[in-house]
């Protein structure tokens, strides 16, 4: 990338500081911007990063789940934003060599939490590929599975969860979501809904652009075709084994 283009990126990202994020997952959008600026050796606001990290730590409720702000709500915001952006902020700050916090150590701890959360997500997928629709922002569709896809992409799936079973589970969930439910309008764009056109499922901030957060579950596409995620023989996922009377790993509290 030429220097002029680099400086344009820096200028535009820096201009986002006018946004005063509320005490919610929005803090991580700010930390993502500032950690990027740190990594490219531009002027960055360390306070915006560290204050976001402190709040996310404060909002951890245990066993892989975060509260999106001071009051807990049962939704998929751990999937849409919190787990992925928390990990990415910590990784980027560590890569940038920023001193102050033990960003690498915090990343290791956050990774374990995401592994437990991804284990739960895998267990959410029913034997026939459905997963529960609950909480706000459900028109983001398959973005609910982003951390599971991310752990597959990282090569960091939790023990007892194989790459093949994740591939098979996600594939079946994609089929259930997109095969025959009128998910696209006449222009070929996604409709507002969890699966199909369900405008009543929208929140006031839902728009046609945000629907494409569903593509966040495509992270394993970053793996080469020769990767074991793609080449391993199909395997049943947890709920298939459980409902067919086969042995499956016992779940338990992690922390």
What kind of feature is each model-predicted range?
Residues 11-20, 57-64, 112-124, 169-184, ...:
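Short, mixed-charge aromatic SLiMs
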